[in-house]
Amino acid sequence: MKSVKYIVENPRDALWGLSITTVGYECYKANDPYPSKEHNSGYYFDPDKGRTIQEYQLCYITEGVGTFKSASCPSCEIRSGMMFLLFPNEWHTFSPHKNSTWKQYWIGFKGINIDLRAENGFIKKEKPLFN
């Protein structure tokens, strides 16, 4: 099951200092291919190669066990109840373990307000996991 909404930003949105770019959720059964080929081409990735994106994304795992890794964070286990933050232009990869179910929710966003939080150390690439 999948539901994704990619939001078209207009110049007025940027005046708020924070714009939503995408929101959605996906559910996978054990051994399902991940990610779904239905991903938008700008977001699809091979978990063995990883990717970079142009905005922040907060991902919330509500079911399952998997692995997360980024350029600034070594490989670590992620599980139900955890969230992780993806940073713009920061290489990352994540995926469920093959034998695990997986439910993930996410919201993507960008803007000067969140950039300032990162610049002032409130959020850090080296500490992207929350539980």
State what each model feature region is.
Residues 30, 63-65, 83, 89-91, ...:
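Short, charged/polar surface micro-motifs in flexible loops or helix N-caps
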Residues 72-87:
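Short acidic-glycine-tyrosine-enriched beta hairpin
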